[in-house]
UniProtKB/Swiss-Prot annotation:
Subunit annotation: Homotetramer.
UniProt-listed Enzyme Commission number(s): 4.1.2.17
Keyword Membrane among UniProt keywords: no
Record-given protein name: L-fuculose phosphate aldolase
Cofactors named for this entry: Zn(2+)
Any one annotated GO CC term: cytosol
Chain coiled-coil ranges: none
Gene Ontology biological-process annotations: pentose catabolic process
Pathway noted in the entry: Cofactor biosynthesis; coenzyme F420 biosynthesis
Primary role: Involved in the biosynthesis of the coenzyme F420 which requires phospholactate produced via the aldol cleavage of L-fuculose 1-phosphate and the NAD(+)-dependent oxidation of (S)-lactaldehyde. Catalyzes the reversible cleavage of L-fuculose 1-phosphate (Fuc1P) to yield dihydroxyacetone phosphate (DHAP) and S-lactaldehyde. FucA possesses a high specificity for the dihydroxyacetone phosphate (DHAP), but accepts a great variety of different aldehydes such as DL-glyceraldehyde and glycolaldehyde.
NCBIfam families: FucA_Meth (NF040649)
Length: 181
């Protein structure tokens, strides 16, 4: 696993305010191993040695994985095509979920990269129920009501691009709402 790229993506998420404080988490699956951000970590200050490791059976190999580890684990078990997961608290995407407004795919990039957005009702962060309901979704981009977003990818860059494009579509959706009033 490319730990330098993992750290670089985590810093981008933090620097671009897709996550704040100790919010959000990232994972990469390689073979039967999952590399995850540790619980309570601040993604903008993560170091290579901080990265936690688990196997696909849920056994911790190194560190203390994110409290959302079950969400990552259940998605990887269900989706063989997914090798990276990014969970953020992107501001506009999350805000729209609080007012029950679905994000519209308004540009070619939105339609190409996101295709379709899934939605999950509110469940407590880190709960087994949240993990189960999220893993039931077939989309690569999932909005967690009043919580954040989960973007899945064939690799870390693919998942990251979906985070960026989703937030752009959310901003456009919000602007559309404001103009229509």
């Amino acid at each position: 696993m490319d730990k330098k790229q993992f750290i670089k993506i985590c810093r981008k998420l933090y620097d671009r305010k897709y996550v704040v404080g100790s919010g959000g988490n990232v994972s990469v699956k390689e073979g039967d191993k999952i590399y995850l951000t540790p619980t309570g970590s601040i993604l903008g200050f993560l170091k290579e040695d901080d990265i936690a490791e688990m196997d696909l059976d849920g056994n911790v190999i190194k560190g203390k994985p994110t409290s959302e580890k079950n969400l990552h684990l259940m998605i990887y078990r269900k989706r063989n095509d997914i090798n990276a997961i990014i969970h953020t608290h992107s501001l506009i995407s999350t805000f729209l979920s609080t007012i029950n407004k679905e994000i519209e795919l308004l540009t070619p990039e939105g339609k190409i990269f996101l295709k379709k957005i899934g939605y999950v009702d509110y469940y407590e962060a880190g709960s087994l129920k949240l993990a189960e309901e999220t893993a039931k979704r077939d989309e690569d981009v999932i909005i967690l009501k009043n919580h954040g977003v989960v973007c899945l990818g064939k690799d870390l860059i693919d998942a990251y691009i979906k985070v960026e494009v989703l937030e752009e579509q959310a901003k456009l959706t919000l602007l559309n709402l404001l103009v229509k009033k």
